[in-house]
């Protein structure tokens, strides 16, 4: 495991943890002699021991603060060269200069890691989380109750951010599904449009063919009508001439009888 990166949260010096995990056997525990066990035969009986008043157990404030810090900000562990190292959060109180230095380090890291000033930025969120943890550490050393209250605030913020992140991921997944569906619908629509355009071209070709046939038919009918009209006119003229001739002949026959 790679050693943890530098953090704005102040830690103590790393400590090498002993990897001797041997456990005492049950037999070893049974070999203990009870204080009430009688001695060997012939020996004088033991007198009861006088119980001395014990001093009242006063909790060590420093140790109590360290325990609270370890509960709020757990130590970080890593393995290096098959050796387990542990690094606890520092319990050293901070001064005003430490706070000023923390602000300078925050601004420097934001600039070095090119964190975005606006919008969603994981780098900016990570650095501000480290800064907030460091502030919780500094406050907890001076007042454990205030530190625990800040811990609740931090956990609430993380829970809210996690909920928003889950909602964002769900929205992105929903948007991707809708985009894929729209893309698939677009492909189907494009295919249908291509089919309709092909059908349209076929229908236009058929319309043009029918128009050509209609024009040819109209032309033939017009020519036939003209021929028929000419023929009818010639027949009418012939019949008129015949009628005039017959009329003249009839008048010639009738006129001498008078």
Curated annotation (Swiss-Prot):
GO cellular component terms, A-Z: axoneme; ciliary base; dynein axonemal particle; dynein complex; motile cilium; sperm flagellum
Pfam family, one: Ax_dynein_light
Coiled coil: 176-255
Location within or outside the cell: Cell projection, Cilium; Cell projection, Cilium, Flagellum; Dynein axonemal particle; Cytoplasm
Record's compositionally biased regions (Low complexity): 34-48
The keyword Cytoplasm is assigned to this record: yes
Record carries keyword Coiled coil: yes
Single GO MF descriptor: dynein heavy chain binding
UniProt keyword list: Cell projection, Cilium, Coiled coil, Cytoplasm, Dynein, Flagellum, Motor protein
Region (Disordered): 19-60, 207-231
GO biological process, one term: sperm flagellum assembly
UniProt record similarity statement: Belongs to the inner dynein arm light chain family.
Function: Involved in sperm flagellum assembly.
Description of how the protein assembles with itself and partners: Interacts with CFAP45. Interacts with DYNC1H1.
Name recorded for this polypeptide: Axonemal dynein light intermediate polypeptide 1
Organism: Macaca fascicularis (Crab-eating macaque)
Gene: DNALI1
């Amino acid at each position: 495991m790679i050693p943890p990166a530098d953090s704005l949260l102040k830690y103590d010096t790393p400590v090498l943890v002993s990897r001797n995990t041997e456990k005492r056997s049950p037999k070893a525990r049974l070999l203990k002699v009870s204080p009430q066990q009688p001695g060997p035969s012939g020996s004088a009986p033991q007198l009861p021991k006088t119980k001395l008043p014990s001093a009242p157990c006063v909790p060590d404030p420093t140790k109590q603060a360290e325990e609270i810090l370890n509960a709020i900000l757990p130590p970080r562990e890593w393995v290096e060269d098959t050796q387990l190292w542990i690094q606890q959060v520092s319990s050293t109180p901070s001064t005003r200069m430490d706070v000023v230095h923390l602000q300078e380090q925050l601004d420097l890291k934001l600039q070095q890691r090119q964190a975005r000033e606006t919008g969603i930025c994981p780098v900016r969120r990570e650095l501000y989380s480290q800064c907030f943890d460091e502030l919780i550490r500094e406050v907890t050393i001076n007042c454990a109750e205030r530190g625990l209250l800040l811990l609740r605030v931090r956990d609430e913020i993380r829970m809210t951010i996690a909920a928003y992140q889950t909602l964002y991921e769900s929205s992105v997944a929903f948007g991707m599904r809708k985009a894929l569906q729209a893309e698939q619908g677009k492909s189907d629509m494009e295919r249908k449009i291509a089919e309709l355009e092909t059908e349209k071209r076929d229908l236009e070709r058929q319309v043009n063919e029918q128009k050509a046939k209609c024009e040819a038919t109209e032309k033939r009918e017009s020519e036939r009508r003209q021929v028929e009209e000419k023929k009818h006119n010639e027949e009418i003229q012939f019949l008129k001439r015949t009628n005039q001739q017959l009329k003249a002949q009839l008048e010639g026959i009738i006129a001498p009888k008078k």
